[in-house]
Curated annotation (Swiss-Prot):
Naturally occurring in which organism (per UniProt): Saccharomyces cerevisiae (strain ATCC 204508 / S288c) (Baker's yeast)
Modified residues (Phosphoserine): 94, 399, 558
Gene behind this protein: SKO1
Protein name stated in the entry: CRE-binding bZIP protein SKO1
Compartment annotation: Nucleus
Coiled-coil ranges per UniProt: none
Length: 647
């Protein structure tokens, strides 16, 4: 059924017919496409047509709606009007004015709250309708749309300069949710444009509407239409409070919307409102009155600026601190028309104030939720950062108080540790110097002992050389051996061979033997005396057989220790007592008398001399004279004992 046919229906509509049925609303479809609040899609109108509607379309539908409004009688004056629809469903069906008519489609704003009942809070009467009776027509204006410009931003729905819901043009916080240029006005039409001029019927009709059943749910949260909230994603008009002083011609200009503390400029945005007598209505009233709205935002989705950081907390603060005084404007409008309606309007305005404060706390869409999460994260991060900074400052203060003595203790400990380290270093240096000094002294002593030992060895060598030379000369004379000119050279032994021409007369031992063999005792005694003289001239006989090294150790007391060490370490030096004495076997002098005379020949004497020479080099007792075996002294007396001694 078209809107023209509905407008021709009888105007007998009861209050019961206007009451929405919750049971029917529970079956209402919520899968339909979302539309911006303030723009209600008519079943017979497509989206593109609703976006591009002109002012003539608004005028046509406004005439139809006004005819329906004038045909509804007034009833109880204390009934309230709601301006909110169900929150849980995006679109809800509203009751039709006449039985049998097709119910218009009610599109709720995209403020969806999970849970709650299907009942909606009562609708708020638009303050601009209250001033309908006092408003005057302006025949010079031809447009019925509301245009918003960014040339001079001011409050569009939150405040009005005179007699609106918000009498003050600015909130105490100095900000408003929606800005509008003060010179942008909404035009109203006169009777010549097709609108009735009976202004008293509209408030009466609205006040005679019974309760629509759209009451708050159990959680006391409004879930229906929420006029007055303009978010970044859904920039729909809310509660346009425009009085007769601000009604001027509209212009298609740019719009500057201040959202969350940032100004957004959106060119060519035309906001169209459903109007009754040229006065805009709220989306809830337009749906209840079966008024199709053709006003569409040209650019419904706006991009948020990077500086948009304020969230619903700022919205709540700006709204709660803006000193809402709907009672003042409501009282001023109602007292001029009907004093009986004053109480109901005041009550509804009070309810609207409470519901408005609750509604502003609800997030409008997913983007708003995301921004809220971001804000919470930023707030939590900033709060944690501030807490951390406070803790750090407190800890720095405490540490500044506690570190003063701690630093002193550390300095003292460092000094002590440094002193200990210095002492340890000095001790190590002292020990090192002492060690080096001991090594130096030991090295010097060792060098000194080495020099002394070398000198001692040289002296020993010289001593043994002199002793060797002395003994060599004596033994050479006794044996008839002529030593060489040099003591270091090999011995040159000239042994006389037995021959007739050269008897062995050079050997004293041989001469003595020959004298004895001839029984020439006088010659024998002379040979023995010579031999005794040679032996007495030796150094060994003069020392009495003592070791000269022992005498040197006794004379030099300073070298006693070194000498003992040398003796113990050098076992190659034989001791004095271990040296054999050559003349340890003595023979008696009277043994020569026992020698028997024999008629031996010279050959026998020669053999005896040869045996004597051989015995000097091979026999251990070279001084034993080997006589004939039959003439050998059986008593074994020492022969040298009979030799004369030169005392």
């Amino acid at each position: 059924m078209s809107s023209e046919e509905r407008s021709r229906q009888p105007s007998t509509v009861s209050t019961f017919d206007l009451e929405p049925n919750p049971f029917e609303q529970s079956f209402a479809s919520s899968k339909k496409a979302l539309s911006l609040p303030g723009t209600i899609s008519h079943p017979s109108l497509p989206k593109e047509l609703s976006r591009n509607n002109s002012t003539s379309t608004i005028t046509q539908h406004s005439q139809r709606s006004t005819h329906s409004l004038n045909s509804i009688p007034e009833e109880n004056g204390n009934s309230t009007v709601t301006d909110n629809s169900n929150h849980n469903d995006v679109k809800k069906d509203s009751p039709s004015f006449l039985p049998g008519q097709q119910r218009p489609t009610i599109i709720s704003p995209p403020i969806l709250t999970p849970g709650g009942s299907k009942r909606l809070p009562p609708l708020l009467l638009s303050p601009s309708i209250l001033y309908q009776a006092n408003s005057t027509t302006n025949p010079s204006q031809n447009s019925h749309s509301v245009s918003v410009s960014n040339s001079n931003p001011s409050a569009i729905g939150v405040s009005s300069t005179s007699g609106s819901l918000y009498p003050n043009s600015s909130s105490p916080s100095g900000t408003s949710l929606i800005r509008q240029p003060r010179n942008s006005n909404v035009t109203t039409s006169n009777s010549g444009n097709g609108f009735p001029t009976n202004d008293s019927q509209m408030p009466g009709f609205l006040l005679n509407l019974s309760k629509s059943g759209l009451t708050p749910n159990e959680s006391n949260i409004r879930t229906g239409l929420t006029p007055g909230i303009l978010t970044q994603s859904y920039n729909y008009p809310v509660l346009p409070s425009i009085n007769k002083n601000t009604i001027t011609g509209s212009k298609n200009v740019n719009k500057s919307v201040t959202v969350n503390g940032s100004i957004e400029n959106h060119p060519h945005v035309n906001i169209m409102h459903p109007t009754v007598n040229g006065t805009p209505l709220t989306p809830g009233l337009s749906s209840l009155l079966n008024l199709p709205s053709t006003g569409v935002l040209a650019n419904p989705v706006f991009k948020s600026t990077p500086t948009t950081n304020t969230t619903d907390g700022t919205v709540n603060n700006s709204i709660s601190n803006s000193n809402f005084s709907p009672n003042t404007s409501t009282k001023a409008a109602v007292k001029m028309d009907n004093p009986a309606e004053f109480n109901a309007i005041e009550h509804s305005a009070h309810n609207h104030k409470e519901n408005e404060n609750l509604t502003t706390q609800i997030e409008n869409n997913d983007q708003f939720n995301n921004k809220t999460r971001k804000r919470k994260r930023r707030m939590s991060s900033t709060s944690s950062t501030s807490k951390a900074s406070r803790k750090n400052s407190i800890s720095r203060k405490n540490s500044a108080v506690t570190t003063a003595p701690a630093q002193k203790d550390d300095v003292e400990n460092n000094k002590i540790s440094n002193n200990v380290t210095l002492d340890e270093n000095e001790e190590q240096e002292r020990k090192r110097k002492e060690f080096l000094e001991r090594n130096r002294v030991a090295a010097s002593k060792f060098r000194k002992r080495k020099k002394e030992y070398i000198k001692k060895i040289e002296n020993d060598l010289q001593f043994y050389e002199s002793e060797y030379d002395d003994l060599t000369q004596v033994i050479g004379k006794l044996c008839g051996i002529i030593p060489s000119s040099s003591s270091n050279s090999q011995f040159n032994v000239n042994v006389s061979t037995p021959s007739s021409s050269s008897p062995p007369s050079t050997s004293l031992i041989a001469l003595l033997e020959s004298s004895i063999s001839r029984s020439d005792y006088s010659s024998a005694m002379s040979v023995l005396s010579n031999m005794k003289q040679l032996i007495c001239e030796t150094n060994f006989y003069r020392r009495g057989g003592k070791n000269p090294r022992d005498d040197m150790d006794g004379q030099e007391d300073s070298f006693n220790k070194d000498t003992n060490v040398v003796k113990s370490e050098n076992a190659g030096y034989p001791s004095v007592n271990s040296r054999p004495i050559i003349l340890d076997k003595k023979y008696s002098l009277n043994s020569g008398a026992n020698i028997s005379k024999s008629n031996t020949t010279t050959n026998n004497v020669g053999n005896s001399a040869q045996n004597i020479i051989n015995s000097c080099y091979s026999v251990t007792n070279p001084l034993v004279i080997n006589a004939n075996s039959d003439t050998h002294d059986t008593n074994k007396h020492d022969v040298l004992s009979t030799l004369p001694h030169n005392n």
